[in-house]
């Protein structure tokens, strides 16, 4: 542990075993309440709506050593935990974790999707791993909007062809815009949905299904394109925050550290809002590390606008 840090906070030493023990002892209920309150505060500072935000839902597996974390085993030779996350996306510089759950890595994403969905009139952008006829019907009937991809073997019945007003998208061009029924026989949706087919610049064909009929086909394509922002968030979380190395080998300790990492992300984002800074969360976090022993004025001067 950094000796200067110990001196600044007036302790003689801080060893790995102490961090391990303390991380495991923290009440998970307390951490969840802190996360919830911070998320609400961010939401008040940067309110979201149907027209201004998207809810990006996905999961990431945090691999663990099977010998050190036997409770996290999910395959014969593998261990890990899975973070299921709802990331509120307003724009490229404005996104923050809003809801999450943590499970063993073997848990299927679909089983925990409902835990992350709580806003009517919101648009949930998800990958095709969540694609399910009953789920799409339920989301629609419960007042939620969605944007996702169909599976390659999805049966599609075209009801109506719509002529796109514009064909160029951020990552390709619109091939078709249709009103459709998905599925067939005894396995199908009960509602009419919209299917936008896109040919990407990499020559991939994406079939995007949604219940948003109020926006253009290019907007639908661009909505799905934002899904990659949650992948970048996961990458940032793993590489630049504190879940590269878990201090505790216990299940509660490991999960607590992931929650603490999400709390740190929200705190960093609140600082970004307070400063009206254009810096990324990673840039702010890095400055915390390099300027942690400097006066607050030094840090503020660096990130004060203008």
Which role does the model predict for each range below?
Residues 12-13, 18-26, 30-37, 49-53, ...:
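Single, function-defining residue in the core of a domain
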Residues 42-46:
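Alpha-helical solenoid repeats of the armadillo/HEAT superfamily
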């Amino acid at each position: 542990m950094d000796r200067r840090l110990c001196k600044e906070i007036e302790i003689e030493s801080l060893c790995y075993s102490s961090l391990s023990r303390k991380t495991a002892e923290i009440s998970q209920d307390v951490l969840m309440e802190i996360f919830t309150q911070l998320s609400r505060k961010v939401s008040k500072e940067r309110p979201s709506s149907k027209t201004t935000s998207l809810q990006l839902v996905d999961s990431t597996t945090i691999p663990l050593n099977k010998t050190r974390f036997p409770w996290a085993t999910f395959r014969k030779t593998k261990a890990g935990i899975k973070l299921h996350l709802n990331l509120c996306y307003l724009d490229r510089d404005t996104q923050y974790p809003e809801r999450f759950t943590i499970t063993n890595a073997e848990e299927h994403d679909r089983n925990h999707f409902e835990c992350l969905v709580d806003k009517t009139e919101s648009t949930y952008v998800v990958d095709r791993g969540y694609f399910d006829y009953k789920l799409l019907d339920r989301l629609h009937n419960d007042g939620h909007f969605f944007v996702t991809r169909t599976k390659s073997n999805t049966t599609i019945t075209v009801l109506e062809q719509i002529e796109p007003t514009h064909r160029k998208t951020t990552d390709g061009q619109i091939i078709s815009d249709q009103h459709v029924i998905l599925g067939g026989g005894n396995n199908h949706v009960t509602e009419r949905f919209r299917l936008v087919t896109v040919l990407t610049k990499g020559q991939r064909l994406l079939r995007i299904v949604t219940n948003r009929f109020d926006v253009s086909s290019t907007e639908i394509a661009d909505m799905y394109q934002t899904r990659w922002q949650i992948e970048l968030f996961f990458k940032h979380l793993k590489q630049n925050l504190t879940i590269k190395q878990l201090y505790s080998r216990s299940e509660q300790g490991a999960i607590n550290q992931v929650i603490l990492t999400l709390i740190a992300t929200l705190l960093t984002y609140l600082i970004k809002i307070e400063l009206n800074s254009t810096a990324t969360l990673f840039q702010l976090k890095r400055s915390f590390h390099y300027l942690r022993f400097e006066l607050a004025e030094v840090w503020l001067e660096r990130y004060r606008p203008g």
